[in-house]
């Protein structure tokens, strides 16, 4: 096995790990929803979509045989993470400034009309308000943790591409 193949395999393992972590985060959100009674808002659901897209694209990328197809799906992973940054960043802003929320989430009908909301309503249907604060986890709100995860994904995936291909 040459050095480039070894680097690409390391990159693929990282992508599989990233996909598993994203699915675990969705599972954790479902646990908090069902067991702890923390109802998801439209921005929570959009963050779940971003995590799901990251996982799907990461798994597809890990299965790609060539460098170009692998890179294409890694770009989709990063774009999904940027979408997650937008949703989580907006959510963090609303939680920090509850007065900007009018109490009515205008995103709810849009998010509830997305296909997965009809296929799997428990996981992808809106049931709460974005301005509802829940107890922090290790000092950060769930939206802040999601923002950290999306930023790390946006930084680490391109860094891995650069690191694993700079000599290849």
UniProtKB/Swiss-Prot annotation:
Keywords: Cell inner membrane, Cell membrane, Chaperone, Disulfide bond, Electron transport, Membrane, Oxidoreductase, Redox-active center, Transmembrane, Transmembrane helix, Transport. One of its GO terms (biological process) is protein folding. GO terms for cellular component: plasma membrane. It comes from the Bacteria. It is a multi-pass membrane protein. Pfam families: DsbB. The chain crosses the membrane at residues 15-31, 50-65, 73-89, 145-163. One of its GO terms (molecular function) is protein-disulfide reductase activity. It is found in: Cell inner membrane. Gene3D superfamilies: DsbB-like. Disulfide bonds join 41-44, 102-130. Its main location: membrane. Residues 32-49, 90-144 are periplasmic. Residues 1-14, 66-72, 164-168 are cytoplasmic. Belongs to the DsbB family. Required for disulfide bond formation in some periplasmic proteins. Acts by oxidizing the DsbA protein. This is Disulfide bond formation protein B 1. It comes from Pseudomonas entomophila (strain L48). The gene is dsbB1.
């Amino acid at each position: 096995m040459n050095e480039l193949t070894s680097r690409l395999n390391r990159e693929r393992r990282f992508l599989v790990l990233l996909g598993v972590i994203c699915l675990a985060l969705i599972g954790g959100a479902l646990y908090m929803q069902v067991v702890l009674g923390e109802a998801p808002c439209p921005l929570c659901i959009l963050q779940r979509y971003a995590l799901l897209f990251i996982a799907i694209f990461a798994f597809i990328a890990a299965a790609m045989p060539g460098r170009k197809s692998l890179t294409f799906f890694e770009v989709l992973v990063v774009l999904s993470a940027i979408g997650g940054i937008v949703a989580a960043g907006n959510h963090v802003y609303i939680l920090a400034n509850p007065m900007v929320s009018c109490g009515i989430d205008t995103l709810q009908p849009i998010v509830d009309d997305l296909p997965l909301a009809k296929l799997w309503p428990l996981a992808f249907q809106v049931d709460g308000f974005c301005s509802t604060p829940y107890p922090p986890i290790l000092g950060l709100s769930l939206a802040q943790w999601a923002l950290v995860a999306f930023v790390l994904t946006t930084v680490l995936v391109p860094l891995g591409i650069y690191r694993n291909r700079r000599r290849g």
